[in-house]
């Protein structure tokens, strides 16, 4: 699984097309396949965040004839510079896009990070510095 970058989201969308079995969509779209951790399926080298997902289970949904696939993440790759000390990953800084439905692509805008919500507080504390994190606050 790959996070799609803002500068190549149109090619990322086109990769979802049902190409003939003998057509290499990486070649068709000018994307670069890379292989990691013994996985048969390639990741996209241009993606700033890549995840190796192993299929664990699958259920057929009779109401719409779709399949619900359950996977387990086996490996993750991203630039170390995007990782804060407390584990926050700066996706917006990596230039990835968000997807809604099957065809809606969006850019995001950071608002703030909020403290862990607790019943005894009325509103969570805000941390505007996304990379600073809560352990440094």
Predicted regions and their residues:
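Basic, polyanion-binding surface patches
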Residues: 1-137
């Amino acid at each position: 699984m790959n996070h799609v970058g803002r500068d190549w989201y149109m090619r990322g969308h086109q990769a979802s097309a049902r190409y003939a079995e003998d057509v290499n969509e990486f070649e068709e779209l000018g994307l670069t396949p890379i292989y990691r951790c013994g996985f048969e399926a390639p990741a996209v080298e241009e993606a700033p965040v890549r995840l190796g997902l192993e299929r664990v289970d699958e259920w057929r949904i009779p109401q719409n004839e779709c399949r619900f696939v359950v996977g387990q993440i086996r490996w993750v790759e991203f630039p170390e510079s995007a990782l804060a000390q407390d584990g926050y990953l700066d996706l917006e800084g990596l230039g990835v896009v968000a997807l809604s439905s099957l065809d809606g692509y969006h850019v995001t805008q950071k608002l703030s990070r909020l403290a862990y919500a607790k019943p005894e507080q009325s509103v969570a504390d805000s941390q505007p510095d996304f990379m600073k994190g809560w352990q440094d606050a």
